[in-house]
Amino acid sequence: MEKHGNYNINKICVIGLGYIGLPTASMLANHGYEVVGVDVNEKRVNQIKNGELKIEEPGLLTLVKGAINSKNLNVQTSATEADAFIICVPTPALENEDGSKKCDLTYVMGAVQNIIPFLKEGNLIVIESTIPPEITKKIYETIDKKIYVAHCPERVLPGKILKELVENDRIIGGINKKSAEMAKEIYKSFVEGKIYITDSNTAEMVKLMENTYRDINIALANEFAKICDEIGVNVWDAIKIANKHPRVNILNPGPGVGGHCISIDPWFIVEKTNNAKFIRAARELNDNMPAYVCKSVLSELKKHGIKKPKISVFGATYKGNVEDTRESPSKNVIEMLLKNGVTVSTFDPHATCFEYPLSTLDECISGSDCIVVLTDHDAFKNIKKDDIDEICPKLKNKIVFDTKNILEHNLWKRAGFTVKLLGNGAW
């Protein structure tokens, strides 16, 4: 194995082989490092060994197979000795009694404990998992060995992970300068974007700021949508025109915010301080959008005198063209509809695992009173006249509620549908 850089880091142990860990481990292996990928899920490890991925990500299977075939990547269920350890495990949110949330560090601290027996003096630990400020230092303080620790938060978008792993800028924060420089040595092997060096607290805060900014922007759009519903304005048209201003960039409204980052990360700031009232308000507004959508749909059904309705939900994933359902607003919308006595059937062309049963398209629309679009999959955007003509005979009533503004509304109207759009009070 060739020597990499100035710090004799040749063998890397990556803990966690999910959406971030597996691509990172494979990327490093394909760039000459000896990599051991570790995951406590034995089934996942065996699937990776057999070239069977449950992660729907363009190019990932080819990358993983190349890494394994090169003999640079081995996957197993337990940690091992290495020169550097990269932790890529989930940091979900735990709900507090007051409805706020805080970071669940169970998986991160568990990963740290699992690698401690294998640590040698001079080793490096890199935390990629998103964590609250001051946690990297806390991890360093729990280890009674002379090692180096850095935080290099992941910054990739599902569906574009491999492209963004290479092209995106990265931030690396060390508990000291050498920790950051050692981590930079690893990442510059495949990162073509700029790598910014700072302290660990700043790196932690930067990642949280990035996603909090987007969450607040979406909350603003969602509040505009509610206002426009009330005063008779199409929020989508208004946002489009407002964004013509060179210093305005309002994001789109929707049924809520999901995924493993934007819907969770702002809470990691809120838990650290009482000065995050604006951040908390935005988070709560976005969390309440599923209830607003549910109320709007039920109101429309009531106008049509529909009792004991069946609703077809289009979309279970948290965003378009991915199979990831984590923190998806669809789950909350469905839960609220069910509590109101509605029969719900869900169709998603990408999702394979969801909290509620997934149906085929025909099963989903059969006898339905209303179609509610919650995810902006291309499969839904590309519904054409012939598709609508096939759908119509299977429905009981023709109502469609578009929360993402992706349908060709005129096509549906010409087919006899009542079309409702989130945030369009002009209709």
Curated annotation (Swiss-Prot):
It comes from the Archaea. One of its GO terms (molecular function) is oxidoreductase activity, acting on the CH-CH group of donors, NAD or NADP as acceptor. It catalyses: UDP-N-acetyl-alpha-D-mannosamine + 2 NAD(+) + H2O = UDP-N-acetyl-alpha-D-mannosaminouronate + 2 NADH + 3 H(+). The keyword NAD applies. It is an enzyme of class 1 (oxidoreductase). Homotetramer; probably dimer of dimers. Belongs to the UDP-glucose/GDP-mannose dehydrogenase family. Its EC number is 1.1.1.336. Catalyzes the four-electron oxidation of UDP-N-acetyl-D-mannosamine (UDP-ManNAc), reducing NAD(+) and releasing UDP-N-acetylmannosaminuronic acid (UDP-ManNAcA). Gene3D superfamilies: NAD(P)-binding Rossmann-like Domain. The active site is at K207 (proton donor/acceptor), C261 (nucleophile). Disulfide bonds: none annotated. Signal peptide: none annotated. UDP-N-acetyl-alpha-D-mannosaminouronate binds at R155, V156, K207, N211, R214, H245, R247, G258, Y318, K319, K404. This is UDP-N-acetyl-D-mannosamine dehydrogenase. NAD(+) binds at Y19, I20, D39, R44, T91, T130, R326. Pfam families: UDPG_MGDP_dh (PF00984), UDPG_MGDP_dh_C (PF03720), UDPG_MGDP_dh_N (PF03721). GO terms for biological process: polysaccharide biosynthetic process. InterPro entries: 6-PGluconate_DH-like_C_sf (IPR008927), NAD(P)-bd_dom_sf (IPR036291), UDP-Glc/GDP-Man (IPR017476), UDP-Glc/GDP-Man_DH_C (IPR014027), UDP-Glc/GDP-Man_DH_C_sf (IPR036220), UDP-Glc/GDP-Man_DH_dimer (IPR014026), UDP-Glc/GDP-Man_DH_N (IPR001732), UDP_ManNAc/GlcNAc_DH (IPR028359). Keywords: NAD, Oxidoreductase. The keyword NAD applies.
